């Protein structure tokens, strides 16, 4: 079973399913959705002491997310939504819970794990599930 340390490295996005549907479900606008649909970002995962860093790089927008496992924090999404977020790691899977703060926003659960040498992520909000696959760069 994988440990969080196995996630460390640079990953390139190679496959996406239902990403536009997921973005629509959480309220991302049409122009941003269309731009994001064609991106092939790089995800860099690092550990600095007890702080995990997930940095995503693309031609459209770069994002940085830092967290400590088991500690709730306020997260600002790339399109300016705000969440109370919590990361946990159990049975080889990293779970990222984004709990809405504003009534008109939607909560999500993002799950990350390793499978056959790939980094797999699912994003779920309501009944919509997106799957993304990343390969080591």
From Swiss-Prot:
InterPro entries: Calycin (IPR012674), Fatty_acid-bd (IPR000463), ILBP (IPR031259), Lipocln_cytosolic_FA-bd_dom (IPR000566)
Coiled-coil positions: none
Gene that encodes it: lbp-7
Any one Gene Ontology cellular component term annotated for this protein: cytosol
Gene Ontology MF term list: fatty acid binding
Protein name: Fatty acid-binding protein homolog 7
Pfam families to which the protein is assigned, alphabetical: Lipocalin
Alphabetically ordered keywords of this record: Lipid-binding, Transport
UniProt keyword Thylakoid present: no
Family: Belongs to the calycin superfamily. Fatty-acid binding protein (FABP) family.
Gene Ontology biological process terms, A to Z: fatty acid transport
């Amino acid at each position: 079973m994988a440990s969080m340390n196995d996630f460390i490295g640079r990953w390139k996005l190679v496959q996406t399913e239902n990403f536009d549907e997921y973005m629509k479900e959480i309220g991302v606008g049409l122009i941003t959705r269309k731009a994001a649909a064609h991106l092939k970002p790089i995800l860099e995962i690092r550990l600095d002491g007890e702080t995990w860093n997930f940095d995503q790089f693309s031609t459209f927008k770069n994002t940085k997310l830092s967290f400590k496992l088991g500690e709730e924090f306020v997260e600002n999404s790339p399109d300016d939504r705000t969440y109370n977020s919590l990361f946990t790691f159990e049975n080889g899977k990293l779970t990222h819970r984004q709990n809405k703060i504003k009534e008109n926003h939607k909560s999500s659960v993002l799950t990350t794990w390793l499978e056959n040498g790939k980094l797999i992520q699912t994003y779920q909000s309501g009944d919509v599930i997106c799957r993304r696959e990343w390969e080591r760069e």
